[in-house]
């Protein structure tokens, strides 16, 4: 996953900024939100966000939709480390699982499902099967 923010700012500067943010706003998560390359969706007007940890992924997607003024009939997908996260997941959980070594969580958005893998697809189907005979 390529990030324009990473290209523009050296690692040490990014790490120092993320550390400063998490110390100053301990209930907020430093998130970088950028448009996926080759996506025909609108550019977002700002890419740095301080996101409450109790915000769901679905609520964050709503914020992105509003920032890019995306009509409700148009689709939007967000990707974190090439994965489509569950909309009910809390941003704090996603942050802990996927934050970059610099301390930021990098989110890509696109008008199409460019990576095609969801968190559910990564699970082993056998782990989800239940033997109904053993439930009795």
UniProtKB/Swiss-Prot annotation:
Keyword Transport: yes
Record-annotated membrane-spanning stretches: none
GO BP term, pick one: cytoplasm to vacuole targeting by the Cvt pathway
Site (Cleavage): 116-117
Keyword Cell membrane: no
Post-translational modification: The C-terminal 20 residues are removed to expose Gly-116 at the C-terminus. The C-terminal Gly is then amidated with phosphatidylethanolamine by an activating system similar to that for ubiquitin.
Pfam families assigned to the protein according to its UniProt record, in alphabetical order: ATG8
This protein's GO CC annotations: autophagosome membrane; cytoplasmic vesicle; cytosol; fungal-type vacuole membrane; lipid droplet; mitochondrial membrane; phagophore assembly site; vacuole-isolation membrane contact site
Keywords: Autophagy, Cytoplasmic vesicle, Lipoprotein, Membrane, Protein transport, Transport, Ubl conjugation pathway, Vacuole
Lipid-linked residues (Phosphatidylethanolamine amidated glycine): 116
Main location: membrane
Subcellular location: Cytoplasmic vesicle, Autophagosome membrane; Vacuole membrane
Coiled coil: none
GO molecular function, one term: protein tag activity
Record-linked InterPro entries: Atg8-like, Ubiquitin-like_domsf
Propeptide: 117-136
Topology class, membrane: Lipid-anchor
Similarity comment text for this entry: Belongs to the ATG8 family.
Role, per record: Ubiquitin-like modifier involved in autophagosome formation. With ATG4, mediates the delivery of the autophagosomes to the vacuole via the microtubule cytoskeleton. Required for selective autophagic degradation of the nucleus (nucleophagy) as well as for mitophagy which contributes to regulate mitochondrial quantity and quality by eliminating the mitochondria to a basal level to fulfill cellular energy requirements and preventing excess ROS production. Participates also in membrane fusion events that take place in the early secretory pathway.
Name of protein: Autophagy-related protein 8
Gene: ATG8
